[in-house]
Amino acid sequence: SAFNLNKKLIYLESGLRTNNVKDPFPEEGYRQMVSRIADINFCPTSYSASNLYSEQTKGKIHVVGNTVLDNIKKDRSDTSYGNTCLITLHRNENLNILDLWLNEIERFASNHPEIEFIFPAHPNPIILKACENLKKIKVVKPLQHRNLIDILKKCKFVITDSGGIQEEGCFLNKKIIVCRKTTERPEGIPTGHIVMCEDP
């Protein structure tokens, strides 16, 4: 819309890349297109800024950090390591195989009764259908962000396909299993926080 109206465009969270324009679809394509027309690009990390420099992006590039993480910093409650696993799965590319993911997690949960597996389920009918017969995974309604962060702070590890959870989990020093083929937030891989898991 800004481009069509010939308005200045500031792109927050710019520079995130999987470098596969169709994965995730359509987000990656939009990200690449918007950064090319943005007048100012605000990047969360130096890595995301380096993506824009390598693409010879014409707009101004600034590394400004992450406002979500800034908000978490304000909450000074302790981060602990309890016996909880937080699950978030909602991406389009996983919907067709969501039952496979959940079956594998359910099997793992059966072998680890000491861990409570919590899944705040997106209200998508496909997701709710896949949750109907789960016995070892506690399915709950979507949570407010603060409540989600409270669980994240106390959990032992995370299973997710969410980009935001990857950022927040790394910041809180959690182990994260990412149920995707690619990630636009790879900074947590070399630190050992993120483990990519392509298939159920």
What positions do the PLM features span?
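Nucleotide-activated sugar donor-binding and catalytic core shared by glycosyltransferases
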Residues: 1-119, 124-200
